[in-house]
């Protein structure tokens, strides 16, 4: 079965060895993440927070806010009502001529690429929050690799939708899979291809079929694959588009579909809104949480059943991972 082409908005990268090196550093760093807002100076409890949400973009710029306990959450109620994240989202969309996909692509081809390429690279030039995000994302990627560890990947066709800089596509390709990796950002795709070539040049065995890296949008994704993966991408899709996104990804897979998303719970919704209070000067992405039951219902409607699920939750990153198979 030949790999054709696929894509999505985003997913990202960090070599597994680098993530292991960084785990201890991230754990230590998380203990000392400081509060950036005087209004929350009394907060002290550090639970899973902000993660791949609105707060991710601003914390990636070095702004960190922790909310400690029910009293602190209650204290920000008025501020939450006063903010208007939807207006910021609409302003961003308007600047791209009303095209939401283009606005996301523009971001990840410019400041977004610079930020996330650093976070998911090997550089030590990251702050405490960025380090935590790097480790959290890599933990999610590692879970996918662990789930597929018992599979003979030689000749298996895989569509990595929203490949980012190749954190998942590259190791799967080096295990022999025939990869169609794509992303809406040409900068991300270019970086992924460079990283793959560097791995092969360093002595890693190239697969029989070289991976195909392509900068295209989700709607242009086509073909049939043994497995479709879409990691840390749904956060860029509003609720009214998620069902269509899942249906489209499911139509590409003959056997297996693996996706991740930021789950919508009361606690995470509050933390997301707190993050929206501090958008930061280069804040340019929108972020969406999704109810797990809604995601699973969309998967069932598309002919898939959930066979495995995992949760990754660090200080500043949280992601629900689902493995699905044809029902």
Language model features with spans:
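Conserved alpha-helix/loop element of class I SAM-dependent methyltransferases that forms part
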Residues: 131-154
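Conserved beta-strand signature within the Rossmann-like core of class I S-adenosyl-L-methionine
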Residues: 254-263
């Amino acid at each position: 079965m030949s790999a054709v082409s696929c894509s999505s908005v985003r997913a990202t990268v960090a070599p597994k060895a680098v993530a292991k090196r960084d785990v201890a550093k991230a754990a230590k760093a998380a203990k000392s993440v400081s509060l950036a807002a005087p209004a929350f100076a009394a907060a002290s409890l550090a639970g899973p927070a902000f993660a791949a949400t609105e707060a991710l973009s601003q914390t990636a710029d070095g702004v960190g806010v922790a909310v400690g306990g029910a009293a602190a959450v209650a204290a920000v109620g008025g501020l939450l009502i006063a903010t208007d994240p939807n207006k910021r989202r609409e302003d961003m969309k308007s600047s791209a001529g009303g095209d939401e996909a283009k606005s996301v692509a523009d971001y990840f081809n410019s400041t977004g690429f610079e930020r996330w390429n650093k976070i998911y690279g090997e550089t030590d030039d990251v702050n405490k929050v960025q380090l935590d995000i790097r480790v959290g994302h890599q933990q999610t990627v590692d879970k996918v690799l662990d789930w597929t560890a018992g599979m003979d990947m030689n000749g298996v066709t895989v569509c990595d939708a929203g490949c980012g800089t190749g954190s998942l596509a590259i190791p799967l390709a080096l295990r022999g899979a025939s990869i169609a990796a794509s992303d809406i950002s040409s900068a991300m795709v270019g970086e992924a291809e460079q990283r793959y070539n560097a791995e092969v040049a360093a002595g890693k065995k190239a697969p029989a079929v070289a991976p195909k890296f392509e900068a295209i949008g989700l709607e242009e994704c086509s073909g049939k694959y043994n497995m479709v993966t879409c990691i840390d991408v749904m956060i860029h899709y509003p609720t009214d588009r998620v069902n269509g996104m899942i249906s489209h990804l499911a139509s590409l897979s003959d056997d297996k579909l693996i996706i991740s998303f930021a789950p919508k719970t009361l606690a995470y919704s509050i933390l997301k809104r707190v993050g929206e209070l501090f958008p930061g000067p280069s804040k340019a992405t929108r972020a969406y949480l999704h109810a797990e039951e809604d995601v699973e219902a969309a998967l069932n409607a598309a002919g898939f059943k959930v066979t495995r699920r995992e949760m990754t939750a660090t200080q500043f990153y949280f992601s629900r991972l689902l493995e699905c198979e044809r029902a």
